[in-house]
Amino acid sequence: MDYRELVRRECPDMEAIACETAAEAFFRKELLTKGPDPDMEYSIEDFRNLPEGLRAELVDGKLIYLEAPSTLHQEIKGEMHIAVANHIRSKGGRCKVYIPPFDVYISGDDSKVLEPDLTVVCDRSKLGKKGCHGAPDWIVEVTSPSTRRRDLGTKLFLYREAGVREYWIINPENRTVIVYVFETGEDASFYAFDESIPCHVFPDLKIRLSDVV
């Protein structure tokens, strides 16, 4: 049962606004104490009303919580952001690069809202107040034991189907990077941190992760 329906059933005599406020409070409390209900279909309004600081993604009505990243995860993400931003700036490019919190409405609608570790958008018409609406050009995920299955499975499929041009999966544990260039249909390429990794979206950019982490 939808949480709003549940609260309204319990408070039939309340004013509509008061009942809606009670429903929102109940929703936040349930999420904080119990986590998302696997049997419930969550809406974009539910997603936007998540308690402040609670990071999650929305895929076809299902909420997926995101764990707090490790220190190394943050270092890699930050250094990638610096490297890409500096490259774009040095070339006078129009592409934009973002790190979380930054929502990607990967299908262009409200059904799938993801939060990649690094997002590069070259078509500025896709950028809005709420994030990116449509497929970014380049996405990077810094994987962890808790996210690896989704990064290599669900997200890989969603990014490819949406039209993302390039997708990197960085594994800090074994210091490797998997690169997918969906735009050309090439097979995945595998790199170690101490190798110079070429970027498809920016052909004159190469990144050696061992230089920064």
Predicted stretch roles:
Residues M1-V213:
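Gly/Pro/Ser/Thr-rich low-complexity, intrinsically disordered segments predominantly at protein N-termini
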